[in-house]
Curated annotation (Swiss-Prot):
Protein name, UniProt field: Nucleotide sugar transporter SLC35D2
Species in which this protein is naturally found: Pongo abelii
UniProt keywords, alphabetically: Antiport, Golgi apparatus, Membrane, Sugar transport, Transmembrane, Transmembrane helix, Transport
GO biological process: embryonic skeletal system development; heparan sulfate proteoglycan biosynthetic process
Residue intervals annotated with topology Cytoplasmic: 1-38, 90-156, 206-216, 275-280, 336-355
Family of the protein in this entry: Belongs to the TPT transporter family. SLC35D subfamily.
One GO MF term: antiporter activity
Extracellular compartment segments: 60-68, 178-184, 238-253, 304-314
Name of the gene this protein is made from: SLC35D2
Disulfide bond annotation, renumbered to this chain: none
Biased composition (Basic residues): 1-11
InterPro entries named in the record: Sugar_P_trans_dom (IPR004853), TPT_transporter (IPR050186)
Length: 355
C-alpha cells in the first residue's frame, strides 16, 4: 500500500512540470496576442502625435504670419482658456482626474505657471518672426539646455555619443544662422529664451510629476488657470487686446477656423503626447517629434513664403537635421540596451530565487 502511494506521489510530481509548461505556453500566447492587438493603437498614437505637433506649428504660423494677426498674447490667452475649458469639462464628465483647487495648489505648481506662460508666449512670438526652417533648427538649442537642466535638477548623465550629436545640431544651427538673409534679432532672442524656458519647464514638470501630487492633467490645468488673468492684464495694458479687437480678419471664416484650431491645439498636442508616451514610450515621442521637425523644415522652405535660400544656410540646416537623426538613433539604441539589461537582471533574480 505504501508503495502505491509512493508511485502516485511520484506521478503527480512528474506531471507538475508538464502542467506548468502548458500554463506558461498559454500565458506567452496571451501576451503575444495582446501585443498584436496594441500594434494598431501604438501606430495610431504615434501618428496622432506627429500630426498634432505638425499642425500646431503650421496653424500658429498661418495665423500670426500669413493673416498678420497682431497679438501673440491673445493667441496664447485663447490657448489657455481652451485648455482650462476642455480639462474642466473632462473632469466634470470623469474622463480625466486631478485634485480640486485649494490653498496648497499654487505652492505645488510654482514655478511652472510662470514657465508655462513664458514658454508659450515666446514660442508664439518667435513663430511669427522666424521662417519655419530657422524656427525648427533654433529649437534644437532646447535639447542642449534640457541636458543642462536635467543635469542640474535631476542629476542625470548623458553618453559621449549623445553629447556629440547635440553638438552637431548646434553647429548646424550656427552655420545656418550665419547666412540667414531673413535674420530677425527679436525672433532669435525670443526663440533662444523659449529654448531655455522649454528646458526648465520640462525638467520641473518631470520633478513635479515624480512627486505625484497633481498629476499631468492637474499641472496643465492649474498652469493655464493661474496665468489667464495675468495674461489678460498684460494684453490690456500693452494694447494687444485692443489690436486683437480691431483686427479686420474676424469676418474671414477660414481665419476663424484656424484661430480656433490654434486655441485648441495646445491641449490636443498635450493629449497626443501623453497618448504616444503611454502606448509607446518617451523615446518614440522624441523620434516622431524629430521626424516632424524635418518635415516642417523642408515644407517651410517650399511653402512657407518667407524662407530665403542660400547654400550656407541650406547646408547648416542639413547638418542640424543629420545630427537630430543620429541623436534619435543613439537614443533608441541606448533605450533598447537599457531594456535588455533590465530584462536580464530580472531573469537573474528569478534564477537565484528558484535556486
Amino acid at each position: 500500500m505504501a508503495e502505491v502511494h509512493r508511485r502516485q506521489h511520484a506521478r503527480v510530481k512528474g506531471e507538475a512540470p508538464a502542467k506548468s509548461s502548458t500554463l506558461r505556453d498559454e500565458e506567452e500566447l496571451g501576451m503575444a496576442s495582446a501585443e498584436t492587438l496594441t500594434v494598431f493603437l501604438k501606430l495610431l498614437a504615434a501618428g496622432f502625435y506627429g500630426v498634432s505637433s505638425f499642425l500646431i506649428v503650421v496653424v500658429n504660423k498661418s495665423v500670426l504670419t500669413n493673416y498678420r494677426f497682431p497679438s501673440s498674447l491673445c493667441v496664447g490667452l485663447g490657448q489657455m482658456v481652451a485648455t482650462v475649458a476642455v480639462l474642466w469639462v473632462g473632469k466634470a464628465l470623469r474622463v480625466v482626474k486631478f485634485p480640486d483647487l485649494d490653498r496648497n495648489v499654487p505652492r505645488k505648481t510654482f514655478p511652472l505657471p510662470l514657465l508655462y506662460f513664458g514658454n508659450q508666449i515666446t514660442g508664439l512670438f518667435s513663430t511669427k518672426k522666424l521662417n519655419l526652417p530657422m524656427f525648427t533648427v533654433l529649437r534644437r538649442f532646447s535639447i542642449l539646455f534640457t541636458m543642462f537642466a536635467e543635469g542640474v535638477l535631476l542629476k542625470k548623465t548623458f553618453s559621449w555619443g549623445i553629447k556629440m550629436t547635440v553638438f552637431a545640431m548646434i553647429i548646424g544651427a550656427f552655420v545656418a544662422a550665419s547666412s540667414d538673409l531673413a535674420f530677425d534679432l527679436e525672433g532669435y532672442v525670443f526663440i533662444l529664451i523659449n529654448d531655455v524656458l522649454t528646458a526648465a519647464n520640462g525638467a520641473y514638470v518631470k520633478q513635479k510629476l515624480d512627486s505625484k501630487e497633481l498629476g499631468k492633467y492637474g499641472l496643465l490645468y492649474y498652469n493655464a488657470l493661474f496665468m489667464i488673468l495675468p495674461t489678460l492684464a498684460i494684453a490690456y495694458f500693452t494694447g494687444d487686446a485692443q489690436k486683437a479687437v480691431e483686427f479686420e480678419g474676424w469676418a474671414d471664416t477660414l481665419f476663424l477656423l484656424q484661430f480656433t484650431l490654434s486655441c485648441v491645439m495646445g491641449f490636443i498636442l498635450m493629449y497626443a503626447t501623453v497618448l504616444c508616451t503611454q502606448y509607446n514610450s518617451a523615446l518614440t515621442t522624441t523620434i516622431v517629434g524629430c521626424i516632424k521637425n524635418i518635415l516642417i523644415t523642408y515644407i517651410g522652405m517650399v511653402f512657407g513664403g518667407d524662407y530665403i535660400f542660400t547654400w550656407t544656410n541650406f547646408i547648416g540646416l542639413n547638418i542640424s537635421i543629420a545630427g537630430s537623426l543620429v541623436y534619435s538613433y543613439i537614443t533608441f539604441t541606448e533605450e533598447q540596451l537599457s531594456k535588455q539589461s533590465e530584462a536580464n537582471n530580472k531573469l537573474d533574480i528569478k534564477g537565484k530565487g528558484a535556486v
